[in-house]
């Protein structure tokens, strides 16, 4: 079994722009950053309600990224994206956007026009994934992954399923193209049960709880907006859910390289 290394609880909510009240479950600073490689950051917008908005749409205006990828997973609501490559679109419930910043990209993210006009429930995750040195300057790109393209794989002997965004599970493959080997799974169970979700030895493994209560490898119990970091040693991952629960399983081959941060916006924009 993989050893439980740590449990982390997300700090208090803060706003990204005026459209995204996020809990930053983890980021790319601190002593444990190497234990989370290749994953850099995860922001979670827990279920919330937005009122009808007929004025300026809520969101985040144009801003640059470079050297990594952003993965936006929408559960409820809609996000509209545009970027400097000319790509864009609306990400609705169940959809995923996998954007490669690579050598540099400028993009903006707002509530869609349709969602703004009707308001309602909103929930999403944004995950940042590091790129290895040889891919840092790869051309910027955009993968728009509609919900119907994502396999929903039933868990053996249970009432849950794995939405396979990236990687492999039970003979199925996720649609996202990745630069390093990884699994990005959206897992949901409908009742109390125990499941095995083993990951390759040598891989980073993170369990991020979105709802419900989980016990990980008989070691610790987690609730919503908490994350377990497991060791790269071993392969076993056992999850016991005490009730209906949802979590993200993030696993991947670590990138054994130092993480650099741009010293100024001009340096980031220079790659665009």
Regions found by a protein language model. Give the residues of each.
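Jelly-roll (double-stranded beta-helix
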Residues: 1-265
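Positively charged, low-complexity/disordered segments
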Residues: 266-272
